[in-house]
Amino acid sequence: MQKYFLVFLALLSGAPAHAALNVFACEPEWGALAQELGGDQVAVYTATTALQDPHHIQARPSLIASARKAALLLCTGAELEAGWLPVLLRQSGNAQIQPGRPGYFEAAAYVQMLEIPARADRAQGDVHASGNPHIQTDPRNILLVANALAQRLAQLDAANAAFYQARQQ
């Protein structure tokens, strides 16, 4: 019996547990895409639901705590989350997911923006100076973002790079 127990312990110690890559998705469409590309290699937390307006989210303590644990922050960008994302990033204290770092990913950076206004001021109402941030409504954009996201997942989790690239195909 003791021999079997020792063999069991040896097997456990020889196979280190793999921790999933924590992904913080600002909107459900990006959470779904990250889950599709990452499978069981990612743990996705989605900050909003399809019933919420992503323009008007509050950086609640629960969101900040989830962002604090993330290796990748995945948002639309193009000012869609401008009302709450800067506060969330600052309060999270997570250097990995700050703008300019590999853990910060804005989907809008990988597509051609439409409806960019010639001039933007408050007299025109809620105008996005970077263009229409609702990029997920065009399926061609999803493919462009998926390609870039698979590369970013591979960069952040090099041990599973082939897995992410295969799922992107």
PLM-predicted stretches and their roles:
Residues 14-18:
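N-terminal signal peptide c-region/cleavage motif recognized by signal peptidases
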Residues 4-13:
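Sec-dependent N-terminal signal peptides
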Residues 19-169:
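Extracytoplasmic metal-acquisition and chelation regions
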